[in-house]
């Protein structure tokens, strides 16, 4: 199907900042936004291990062409229908980011379509806003690589608080390695299921300073408790997962509530892979309701890294005139959320 009315645009989005390769197609018209396809292929490493950049990049290279063809087929479009190709510029892991950037660049040249480099964090936020309908929330962005409390002001997503060391998702993933928990479908998901069966709340440090937090010491403490358990201590892996979750999520709720009070917001939007966790959503919901507010979150199709969020955020930028030239179509491991000028919002 060919769209000739240029008040309507179609974007192909390519995401590959970590172990998920995602490709999605989105349509923007003056009256609606429509997801045409949203496909993903995940690199899963063996239990007790993480994913190495070189292996993850090889996975993305191996599956990109197939996934792109399937995304176009599901969307029922051809390359001629695509107005722009959006890709994750950063932040993320260097090798997988670069593998997808090179592939997006190749499509741009093959199809003669402009490129739009997208900030991964902004992609999460804009997709969350679209799916949930949250108007102007405080955003808790929590994933394997990022932990930030964000609010919008003067055409920037301002970071009010963040982790001072590792991300909360990285803390959970690395603890899954300690317990040799399966990485399929995701270590954080498997920790969540074990935590539901835990009953003992063990003593784990709580590290919050203002709207910032720290997780590296908490991980070290949890690792030490795991060693005690293996030596015969009277608690289970389920108790450890329960205690770790309760502690780190309480920290996230505290810094989010502080940001809500600071900016006068009654809405919370949780985005990022950790945002799928039902216990985090439950705890955040209790806090928000006590303040007369509400919490918004998406399901795993949109909170876990995906191509459609890159297509959506990229197309929002494209419609304001933004383009990424071939010479500037690089990627970067460090790309702050507040570096992006949000021209499409008032």
UniProtKB/Swiss-Prot annotation:
Signal peptide: none annotated. It catalyses: L-threonylcarbamoyladenylate + adenosine(37) in tRNA = N(6)-L-threonylcarbamoyladenosine(37) in tRNA + AMP + H(+). One of its GO terms (molecular function) is metal ion binding. Binds 1 divalent metal cation per subunit. Its main location: cytoplasm. A divalent metal cation binds at residues 120, 124, 141, 305. This is tRNA N6-adenosine threonylcarbamoyltransferase. GO terms for biological process: tRNA threonylcarbamoyladenosine modification. It comes from the Eukaryota.
């Amino acid at each position: 199907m060919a769209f000739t009315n240029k008040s309507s645009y179609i974007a192909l989005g390519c995401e590959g900042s970590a172990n998920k390769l995602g490709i999605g197609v989105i349509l923007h018209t003056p009256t609606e936004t429509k997801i045409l396809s949203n496909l993903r292929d995940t690199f899963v490493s063996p239990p007790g291990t993480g994913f190495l950049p070189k292996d993850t990049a090889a996975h993305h290279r191996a599956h990109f062409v197939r996934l792109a063809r399937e995304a176009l087929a599901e969307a029922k479009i051809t390359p001629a229908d695509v107005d722009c190709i959006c890709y994750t510029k950063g932040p993320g892991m260097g090798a997988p980011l670069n593998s997808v950037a090179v592939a997006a660049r190749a499509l741009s040249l093959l199809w003669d379509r402009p490129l739009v480099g997208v900030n991964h964090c902004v992609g999460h936020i804009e997709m969350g806003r679209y799916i949930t309908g949250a108007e102007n929330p405080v955003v808790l962005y929590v994933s394997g690589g990022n932990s930030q409390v964000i609010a919008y002001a003067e055409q920037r997503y301002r970071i009010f608080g963040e982790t001072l060391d590792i991300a909360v998702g990285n803390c959970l993933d690395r603890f899954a390695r300690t317990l040799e928990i399966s990485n399929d479908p995701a270590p954080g998901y498997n920790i969540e299921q074990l935590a539901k069966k835990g009953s003992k709340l063990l003593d784990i440090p709580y590290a919050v300073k203002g709207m910032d937090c720290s997780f590296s010491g908490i991980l070290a403490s949890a690792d030490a408790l795991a060693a005690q358990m293996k030596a015969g201590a009277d608690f289970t892996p389920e108790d450890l997962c329960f205690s770790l979750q309760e502690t780190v999520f309480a920290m996230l709720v505290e810094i989010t509530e502080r940001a809500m009070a600071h900016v006068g917001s009654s809405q919370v939007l949780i985005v990022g892979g950790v945002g799928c966790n039902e216990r985090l959503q439950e705890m955040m919901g209790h806090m928000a309701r006590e303040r007369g507010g509400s919490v918004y979150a998406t399901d795993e199709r949109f909170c876990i890294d995906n191509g459609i969020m890159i297509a959506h955020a990229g197309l929002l930028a494209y419609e304001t005139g933004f383009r990424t030239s071939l010479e500037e179509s690089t990627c970067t491991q460090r790309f702050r959320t507040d570096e992006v000028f949000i021209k499409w919002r008032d």
